[in-house]
Amino acid sequence: MKTGRIVKSISGVYQVDVNGERFNTKPRGLFRKKKFSPVVGDIVEFDVQNINEGYIHQVYERKNELKRPPVSNIDTLVIVMSAVEPNFSTQLLDRFLVIAHSYQLNARILVTKKDKTPIEKQFEINELLKIYENIGYETEFIGNDDDRKKIVEAWSAGLIVLSGQSGVGKSTFLNHYRPELNLETNDISKSLNRGKHTTRHVELFERQNGYIADTPGFSALDFDHIDKDEIKDYFLELNRYGETCKFRNCNHIKEPNCNVKHQLEIGNIAQFRYDHYLQLFNEISNRKVRY
């Protein structure tokens, strides 16, 4: 038996990496009976006849899992936003962050296309990133000339997953980091101001101290797994300041003696972050129940 990590999955064939050697495997029928499917990122135990024929016998317990796209055992989710084409959006960024925290993922922020961004817009984005840094996020704002290899190798060890909407430059970033990958890229649609999907599946690529993965771009975010009363926990500063609210289950909206509302009034919480919290709270509150 061998133990390795699934690095690629296409049409029911799972490519497993063991110390740089890759094996094509399939899951045993036991998984189908249990209605359980391995995903990229899983640590698995498998037997092999040769590099093109192996069978997965066991999937080890996942420490976390992103559902869309399915990836497990993520150490850091890098949320990739572009400064322009498509334009930087704090609302979209906050929604990505909520998704990340709902799956117990450590998140950091990467903004691309600095070289295509007017100076005034660069200043505006830098000021916004300072707000996120004060909340506790690590951020980068990069252009075409920045050394991707230096950036990636400075990130923490383990599995790094790049995630973001289509057209923000995830595949371009990886091509600069590892030119031999030659990943397909595409410009954004001029009419829709969003990118076309060029990455169609998740694949892990080796890096000095772990793996890095590109993921298919998002066209929509799914919050079906999140309850309205959980959302405040996924806005880190609201969660932190909310610990001293009068009521333990305070949602920071109309409740009396709310420390979050107090911190908002004195400027310790950014108004746009609170507004995005309210928007998402109301959106999920008004969500139709699915049967």
Curated annotation (Swiss-Prot):
Cited InterPro entries: G_CP_dom (IPR030378), NA-bd_OB-fold (IPR012340), P-loop_NTPase (IPR027417), Ribosome_biogen_GTPase_RsgA (IPR004881), RsgA_GTPase_dom (IPR010914), RsgA_N (IPR031944)
EC numbers: 3.6.1.-
GO molecular function term, any single one: GTP binding
NCBIfam families: ribosome small subunit-dependent GTPase A
GO terms classed as biological process: ribosomal small subunit biogenesis
Family matches, as Gene3D superfamilies: Nucleic acid-binding proteins, P-loop containing nucleotide triphosphate hydrolases, Probable gtpase engc, domain 3
Chief location bin: cytoplasm
Protein name, as recorded: Small ribosomal subunit biogenesis GTPase RsgA
Subunit note: Monomer. Associates with 30S ribosomal subunit, binds 16S rRNA.
Family statement: Belongs to the TRAFAC class YlqF/YawG GTPase family. RsgA subfamily.
PROSITE patterns referenced in this protein's UniProt entry, alphabetically: ENGC_GTPASE, G_CP
Enzyme class: hydrolase
Span of domain CP-type G: 63-221
Purpose: One of several proteins that assist in the late maturation steps of the functional core of the 30S ribosomal subunit. Helps release RbfA from mature subunits. May play a role in the assembly of ribosomal proteins into the subunit. Circularly permuted GTPase that catalyzes slow GTP hydrolysis, GTPase activity is stimulated by the 30S ribosomal subunit.
Residues noted as binding GTP in the record, renumbered to the chain: 112-115, 164-172
GO cellular component entries: cytoplasm
Domain of life: Bacteria
Organism: Staphylococcus aureus (strain MRSA252)
Ligand binding (Zn(2+)): 245, 250, 252, 258
Location within or outside the cell: Cytoplasm
CDD domains membership: S1_YloQ_GTPase, YjeQ_EngC
Keyword entries, A-Z: Cytoplasm, GTP-binding, Hydrolase, Metal-binding, Nucleotide-binding, Ribosome biogenesis, RNA-binding, rRNA-binding, Zinc
Cofactor binding remark: Binds 1 zinc ion per subunit.
Cofactor(s) it depends on: Zn(2+)
SUPFAM superfamilies: Nucleic acid-binding proteins, P-loop containing nucleoside triphosphate hydrolases
Transmembrane helix in keyword set: no
